[in-house]
Amino acid sequence: MAYQISGNCIGCNACVDSCPTKAIVVQDGEYWINPLLCNDCEGFFPEPQCVSLCPGSAPQPYEAMKGRNRTVTARIRSSPPLFLNGHSQAFASSIVVWEACNFLSQFQSLNLQKQGDNQVCYQKSVGHNQGSLTLTLCLDGIPQSAPIDVRTACLHLIFAAYAAGLDSPWKESFVFTDSQLESYLGWDKRKDLSKMTRLHLFMTWIEQLCRIQVSIDWPDQGRVKGFSVPAGPLWRLLKMHRHFQKDEQGCNHLVGLTWAIQPGEWTRYFLNRQGCRQGQAFYQYSSLPLSLLQAVMSHWQHHEGAMRLLLWLLFKVRMGRQQRLTVPTLMRVAYGEERLQEAYLNLQERKRLVRTFESDLEVLNHYGLKPEFDPLTYPSSIQPLWARLEAVPEDADEALNFWIEDANNGGLLTAAGPRGKWGLLMQARIQRFHLPSDWHRQAVQEARSPTRESGSRQRRRAKSAPVATDSDLPGPPENPKDFPSSKALRGADISAARRQKGISQRELAQRLGRSQSWVRDVENGRLQISLNDRQRLIKALYLDPRQQQV
């Protein structure tokens, strides 16, 4: 049973130091007991210390405040809100932010080094092993059962977005409220979490974030000379202001929170706009999709591996168009090296891991990160069932004919995986992930904005731009009729163009207003297309007939 402090409190502070769970907080002369931390001193004392020591009998059994909470009006002025366009926001995306995101999302599966004073350390080599980046976390007061929640990485990315809006983040700070966090994470529409539970989670996650220490030893890189950043906070908590509301008995109830955070010293070298122009520092930023934050908050419990991949791919896709990712690499990110090694030795664990991995890939596909399987190393026989079922037509009659044809071929579509599927998966690759539109929108705007970069650097940046989806590609030719129409499009041309654009047969059929079986028959050469269909295909695939195969 939890307790609360009534208006009879005389302010003797006898209860504050004696509370074993540190649930009692004093702010501006107001006393408040966190009901989620107060446990009646169970396991510490035979009776609650606040009750036994209080001379005025102020502590009373906790009762939730009835009615709606009043709107908090006396807040500290917060920083400008994020995601004003409703889709994305620029955020600091340097290697410090990336590795800290990995540290938070993969905490329970990383090979961490234990240090004295109950600390764990994560170290990453940089600059061809000439430098290092070290993250350290003190575990005092953090439960061992679930020390770090993957959702903490979402707040880390929100902090990085706030930091990107500061001119000199190592000298400035940003202010935000619990209501803003709820809107970013999609909690403003959820009814399954009480207000007190949300506030307690925010307090826990932000406390964990501000405990992380980062130290950097960076070698020379281009015009930027080597530098060292001594151990300091990744994010420094300057202030956390609690907003209370009193009930009829004079007991305080927490109804809101406001934080002031200052980015660490690392931003002087990785988020320094002026220093970047002078060749003395880096200024690295990218686009943070709002949908990513809300997807993590929705799927973290049942698909934690998929959410780890989602957070990792947010940074990985910035490194080039053709990032051929092996299945073992993705599994290490999603489940950790230890579980992967266990699967090598245990048949049942292999089966469970493959099922989990294919389910997590499906979650990413539904989100909009569509994997493109390498046809040589990742053939359809070992692809997930959901990927193979995309070939099934939506029309009932066509679907019936499709299944009849598949049955005549031995039921290849739904057949069990081949013998030795695990070994084949360990050699399989995913060529790339096609991105949803909100992942690419900011990149397109950045490419169009004027910069001071040299031509060669701009060309390198263009080569490493993220992969766009169909909606982000340039429009079709202004007048497709100008293309020569003397030679009919070949099925191989259509299939190659469709695969190059990352479009499935079903998507192409929807664009053309045709059935999926019609597209399949055209690509297989069983149907000849009319001039009208040919022009519509050119529009859909932006295909130049002058580049057809001979």
For each predicted feature, which ranges?
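Ferredoxin-like iron-sulfur electron-transfer modules
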Residues: 1-11, 22-46, 58
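Recognition helix of helix-turn-helix/homeodomain-like DNA-binding domains
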Residues: 37, 346, 513-528
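Charged, alpha-helix-forming regions
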Residues: 65-489, 500, 506-507
